Amino acid sequence: MGATVVIGGFFGDEGKGKIISYLAQKDNPTIVVRGGAGPNAGHTIKDGDKTFKVRMLPSGFLNKTSRVMIGPGVVVNPDVFLKEINDFATEGRSFLDNNCGIIEQHHLEADSKGRLKEKIGSTGSGTGPANAERAMRTLKMAKDIESLEKYIIDVPQELNSALDKNENILIEGTQGTHLSLWHGTYPFVTTKDVTASGICADVGVGPKRIDDVIVVFKSYLTRVGTGPMTGELSAEETSEKGWEEFGTVTGRLRRAAEFDFELASRAIMLSSANQISITKLDVRFPNCAGAQSFDELDSESKLFIKNIEDKLGVPVTLIGTGAGVNDVIDLRT
């Protein structure tokens, strides 16, 4: 038992929400906590005939026995936070730290026009302007907002107390390594570091308390908005391969390319990842859709997984074979 961190290895949209939801149900953590920048990152979760699109709460909310928390490093839109508590029926087990920054209307307006929108391709969520104001030490905090009062808790204290009791916690990263403010394709990046160390700092858990770092890669590469992307496919090529996707927050068509081993290797290095999760294997290899064991995969998809392990030197432990939360091959021992 201990702390597991899940991060994205590319440019976001790797399928972290699905993997985190699976782990939340399979490993039954006491707490699932979200780090990252803010509501600019969305996770899509399909559970049975229901599809959830989450922007503020951790994706592990489907486990009704887990408490879900937002770390102090995250900026919060109170309207989105409160709506998700209501929509996903998590009242009584949803919390945020009193030091979470607050997104206000003027942040939304600033994020939806000018350079941020036109050149960087911002999501318009207000996250960037709010984090900029936080750096200037003028941002309102969660403790200043009356409607959030009953949800406020000392998140780092809760997490570390749980670890002291040998309980299991799941730390959820957002976006992807190559959108990191420090390590990404600047200036086409987010407003925070979203590697494992950055996410842990966001929630208040020290590096010596982390047992596993799982980096999530999709079986192909996608990116929303502007910024460099090696080997980018045309819209026609993307459609022919069946790789058309749209952003959870923006609704924009995602750009696509082949799996990038150079980016993947650097993501592993930057976060000391000791496990890899590959998602959407079924999109690349339709014959493996719904597979629940490695033996069920065809030779082509097995070779794809083996090639990733051989080139990156890290074991693939979780393989997504469908849209559902439980469409996962779990190779962890």
What does each model-found stretch correspond to?
Residues M1-T333:
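Non-transmembrane, aqueous-exposed alpha-helical and coiled segments at domain scale
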